[in-house]
A protein has these predicted regions:
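Short, conserved catalytic/metal-binding motifs centered on acidic residues
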Residues: 1, 38-49, 83, 117, ...
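Active-site-proximal, Lys/Arg-enriched surface segment
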Residues: 2-89, 101
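Flexible, glycine-rich phosphate/dinucleotide-binding loops
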Residues: 50, 92, 167
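Short, glycine/charged-enriched secondary-structure capping and boundary segments
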Residues: 56-59, 148-152, 173-175
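Electropositive, glycine- and tryptophan-enriched low-complexity nucleic-acid-binding patches
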Residues: 64-132
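Short, structured patches in soluble enzyme cores that scaffold and shape functional sites
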Residues: 85-87, 99-101, 139, 160-164, ...
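Domain-level cores of phosphate- or acyl-group-handling catalytic modules
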Residues: 107-169
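An anionic, glycine-rich sequence signature occurring as long contiguous blocks
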Residues: 159-253
Length: 254
């Protein structure tokens, strides 16, 4: 198998993947799993592939690892960004792949991954121009320029993890709205019977330009010592949150 794969060009394999995905989508057997009955969920996920003790090429990423004796060593590695389409809870397949490259000395690893994501989204839009998509990812992608790319350039929706370190003014604005009882609250959600909150168009309070609807989920659980822990999640989305879709949005975002 490896022998034949080595003989094929990446473009050839990419075209084969595209035909397989389009065939599955046209079959309509996964339509019921679309978000809000419309959007295909596409998850961005970075994965490390190859590690080297010496620099392999100009595009190598670099990290430091502390050894057992306390010494630090440099490791060079290649990382790939995958866009995976969720067809069902059991079926998640690759939609596109892009290498994360070290473009310049002064560019951070986060910027390298964001730039790779932008290249990857462009490829996906070209391959599937009319596919209704909701892009999902961690807090790295919760940047206004990336949201604008998804919503305004490609006309897609998005759900990203929200962290204070990524969108501090947004987080503060949401907390201010929540303290003023401006958020909607629903209890008994999901398997844990937790509590959900949401507020739409928080960007109007935060002074942002991109659509930022915030929703969160909280539930209680016990650790191995039977001590109660509170687990919290918070997300940001371009999709309008309602009482009817909050649980589906939480299950999707998790």
């Amino acid at each position: 198998m490896n022998y034949y794969l080595e003989k094929l060009s990446p473009d050839c394999l990419s075209e084969l993947r595209k035909k397989m995905v389009k065939s599955l989508i046209k079959g309509k057997q996964f339509n019921r799993n679309r978000l809000l009955g419309k959007y295909w969920r596409v998850i961005l996920d970075g994965t490390g592939l190859f590690y080297f003790k010496e620099k392999h090429c100009d595009n190598c990423l670099c990290t430091e690892k502390q050894m057992a004796d306390g010494k630090k060593i440099k490791l060079y590695y290649h990382k790939v960004l995958e866009a995976k389409i969720v067809l069902s809870d059991q079926v998640v397949i690759s939609l596109g792949t892009e290498f994360i490259e070290n473009e310049k000395e002064n560019v951070t690893k986060q910027d390298c991954e964001l730039n790779a994501a932008k290249r990857l989204l462009k490829k996906i839009k070209k391959a599937y121009p009319r596919l209704p998509i909701c892009i999902q990812g961690d807090a790295l992608y919760a940047a206004e320029n990336f949201m604008n790319l998804c919503k305004e350039t490609y006309h897609w929706e998005y759900i990203f993890t929200q962290k204070e370190t990524r969108q501090k003014s947004l987080d503060e604005s949401y907390e201010w709205i929540k303290k003023g009882e401006g958020t909607e609250k629903i209890t008994g959600l999901c398997q844990e019977k937790g509590t959900g909150w949401y507020a739409n168009h928080v960007e109007e309070v935060a002074g942002k330009t991109e659509v930022m609807n915030v929703f969160e989920y909280q539930y209680k659980t016990k650790d191995k010592h039977e001590k109660i822990q509170i687990i919290r999640f918070r997300w940001i989305s371009s999709l309008e949150i309602t009482k009817r879709n909050l649980e589906e949005m939480i299950l999707t975002a998790r």
